[in-house]
UniProtKB/Swiss-Prot annotation:
GO cellular component, as recorded: cytosol
Upper lineage: Bacteria, Pseudomonadati, Pseudomonadota, Alphaproteobacteria, Hyphomicrobiales
UniProt protein name: UPF0301 protein AZC_0488
Family: Belongs to the UPF0301 (AlgH) family.
InterPro entries registered for this protein in UniProt: AlgH-like
Domain of life of the source: Bacteria
Any Pfam family hit: DUF179
């Protein structure tokens, strides 16, 4: 589903949305995406795949996950490099919630494992990137998502036309920003939209 290609902004509403951010509208009927901000990693005629970037996984942090996956022994949990301690664990979406996906800056690349998306953002789903982060050799910026959001062919386009989503250009602050809870309103402000102005009648940007 994930095509190895990069599309640059700006895009028209009929174009594929790789590298764009989806902002859930009040008309979104799926409660799992209430106030969700989704980074689109791949979008084609075959469907779409994205990562929710503003829903923290409250049951586990990055260090504990590294121990669970045997990336580091429990005795090394408190000795992680400072950058590793900053990596947030997110609920990336309702599909394959037991699988991890790392969105990260483009200063780190694994051959045959890293997918460049757009504007210096990459996706890697490999234990090797977790080992690199734990060893202080990982990317400058990263978040780890458990699961992803997926759409069947034409499904995302239909949801956008039904005013389920706004879409806007993504930037590192929306993906890697420290305040996860503030990302949704920040994305709206980047579009010039006040959260209180949203209604079920709004269209896509």
């Amino acid at each position: 589903m994930m095509a190895d290609r990069t599309i640059s902004s700006p895009r028209g509403p009929g174009d594929f949305l790789d590298g764009q951010m989806l902002i859930a509208m009040p008309s979104m009927r799926d409660e799992r995406f209430n106030r969700a901000l989704v980074y689109i990693c791949a979008h084609s005629a075959e469907g779409a795949m994205g990562i929710v970037v503003n829903q923290p996984a409250t049951h586990i942090d990055f260090g504990d996950l590294l121990v669970q996956l045997d990336v580091v022994p429990a005795t090394k949990r408190i000795q992680l490099p400072p950058r590793a301690e900053l990596v947030k664990v997110l609920r990336g979406g309702p599909v394959e919630t037991g699988r991890g996906f790392v969105l990260h800056s483009s200063d780190f690349f694994l051959e045959n494992a890293t997918l460049p998306i757009d504007n210096g953002i990459c996706l890697t789903a490999s234990l090797d990137i977790l080992k690199a982060i734990a060893g202080g050799q990982g990317p400058e910026s990263a978040v780890l998502a458990l699961g992803y959001a997926g759409w069947a062919p034409g499904q995302l386009e239909t949801e956008i036309q039904a005013n389920g989503w706004l879409h806007c250009p993504a930037d590192p602050e929306l993906i890697f920003g420290e305040s996860v809870d503030a990302k949704y309103d920040l994305a709206l402000r980047k579009l010039g939209v006040h959260p209180g102005m949203l209604s079920t009648d709004a269209g896509h940007a």
